């Protein structure tokens, strides 16, 4: 006999509000998997099936660069991505997912950019997104000498855009994510920077659930001369814990979101990552590389078309072809969009199966246990409808 929470998330429903997920998981003891499924619906289906079979909630997300009103580099708009995830949920019979707008990035902070971001946010709200990340970390002022001045533009733009969302969604319990340290830079976010950022947003009535910091990881992967992924071991766990503990000591419930997990050995995550302090783990490039690996075996003609297109358009100087491909193949997704829709049923099954198995491994390494059951319990106890 099925448990109540299973029946609940098997029933067609809207994406789970991110704020409900954040509240329901207290006390925090795990990391929630957040997936950027850039290529093919089968990746989403495989992951959702793994969620259904193990009772998990997952976050499905794409960044502004990946998905936009113009299609980003995946060819997906906010509405088409939302529909893709919904269609996968219908096929699998599992609606335990948050729909997250990742990296709504501010690079200049001028009027034109902010107006465009408002249009992009409107599109995501209309498409039913239930969580939003404002990333103005590029505006860090390296010429300034005080934390207040260094973060001034970051904070002002974060507040402006978070308030824009709040005005649109009112009391809807959406997820809120901020970013104080640009992912991939050499400097580590200071404890004082994280505290100042969260304090200032709080003063403006914005409680951030997740905070992204610069702690030594980067987006994507690095490869050696043979094309093997070089393990990413640069995360500064000590600084991450210091920031999380400092936030908690001041009474903030904000937890860390870890970007740039692809390339980090899963055993390191399982054994060393401070679960609960890091509450959200973003995995994007990993799933794209998974699809390339399957295509190389099951659809070699398509794989080599993609490979040659990437090398021809993006290789610089004597850069290794494998390095060029790993770095720039994401730009092939939009170019070959229609061809991904024509892959064989055998290939689709392979992608789903591989995504399913890998998702199970991430769940285990992240310490995820019965997250759907916990969320269901919270929803029932608080008589929440969404």
Segments from the language model and where they lie:
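Metallocofactor- and cofactor-centric catalytic cores in central/energy metabolism, strongly enriched
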Residues: 2-15, 29-94, 99-102
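C-terminal helical cap(s) of enzyme catalytic domains, especially alpha/beta-barrels
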Residues: 142-154, 223, 227-229, 291-308, ...
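Active-site mouth loops of central-metabolism enzymes
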Residues: 30-41, 72, 100-117, 184-189, ...
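C-terminal hydrophobic structural anchor segments
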Residues: 289-342
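C-terminal extensions of enzymes
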Residues: 1-7, 324-386
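Alpha/beta enzyme core
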Residues: 18-24, 41, 45-59, 63-66, ...
